Amino acid sequence: MKIVRHIPNTITSMNLLCGVLGVIFTFRGALDIAFYLMLAAAVCDFLDGLSARLLHAYSNVGKELDSLADNISFGLLPAMMFHRRLIEGGVTGFVAYIPLIICVFAAIRLAKFNVDENQSENFLGLATPACALWCGSLIYAADHGVMSFAMMLHDTQIIPIASVVLALMMVSRIPMFSLKFKKGSAYNRIRIYFVVMVVLLAVATAILKINWSYIVLVTFTAYIMLNILTALFSLRFTK
């Protein structure tokens, strides 16, 4: 069954393809399609790891390929989407290129992850998919009727500031729980609480008839804030 061993890498390659296509559509100004492709890349990123575990098809090549794909789909793509949004807003010069820092720091974060054996269950620093989906959902929500976000993005300082903050968070030492459930993990309880929160948020969003991208944006905002607060409380009680 040699073909089975190639399934995870095939899915990872689809992740990469989605990222490249997303960048192309971003250049064309089709940010909606770019966000859909980012979501598809995120699904592939989840499935390649899941299939590797189920099929026992781990490989060093797969590990490196996954990081290369992630840097395109969750590093370059969100950076270009932010850059494009600034250009469309009339921003020129150095400020318009500040979002590219996301791509650079995503590469650093992925390289650190590959050599750090302590991040097998949880992360140190913001994971690149979480960063990318926050960026993409912010733009999508602003373009589809969530007025508070649309008004926020009219301030041309928001995207550059967010880019720097997110980039620094990716290479920070802030512990962040992984969303992947693992048998016997002590962190499964907090993962369950988080999933329940997301489900309740989805129900509330459906009742209030808010655009679905709001769920994605609020979910990852809550994820980031929850981990920061947890780290602060842990630091306080360990002193």
Show which residues each predicted segment covers.
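Topogenic membrane-insertion module of multi-pass membrane proteins
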Residues: 1-46, 202-206, 210-219, 223-239
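Short, amphipathic, aromatic/basic-enriched membrane-interface segments that mark the entry/exit
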Residues: 1-10, 61-67, 179-190
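"…together with the soluble PPM/PP2C metallo-phosphatase catalytic core" -> "…together
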Residues: 3-11, 18-31, 36, 90-121, ...
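Multi-pass membrane catalytic core of lipid/isoprenoid biosynthesis enzymes
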Residues: 8-12, 54-113
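Short hydrophobic alpha-helical membrane-embedded segments
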Residues: 9-16, 71-73, 186-198
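Helix-coil boundary and interhelical linker segments in multi-pass alpha-helical membrane proteins
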Residues: 21-36, 76-97, 138-158, 206-213
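Membrane-interface helix caps and helix-loop-helix hairpins in membrane proteins
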Residues: 56-60, 87-90, 114-121, 149-150, ...
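C-terminal membrane-associated helical module and adjoining short loops/tails
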Residues: 124-239
